[in-house]
Amino acid sequence: MSKKTDVCVEKAELYFLPVETRVPLKFGAETLTYVTCARVRVEVEDREGKRAEGWGETPLSVQWVWPADLSYEVRHKALKEFCMELTGAWAEWEVEGHPMEVGHAFLEEALPELLDGFNAGREE
């Protein structure tokens, strides 16, 4: 059942922030001394036209999230490219509902296809 407070994503913006760590962090054979943070701003609108915005941020810790023989730069670039693709997909996502429902629908319906498409033909 829809409610007047249901929201739909109207806009999504992505910012990459370079951050140097205070101390080196070791992940297996690799050492992290800096990281790129992906910061996102999402704007939503409810059925009455009221708007709200929210922010989220996560570090793209290449060595931690993607241990591989590929170079750091190849993995870092791919993570940033996928973040840009996700941001575009969120901006076009037209599902309406409670924010948790909207997010869950994106995870279940959009993300698997986006991930498969992005990974098609990529090296491990």
Q: Language-model segments: what does each one mean?
A:
Residues 36-46, 56-58:
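Short beta-strand elements
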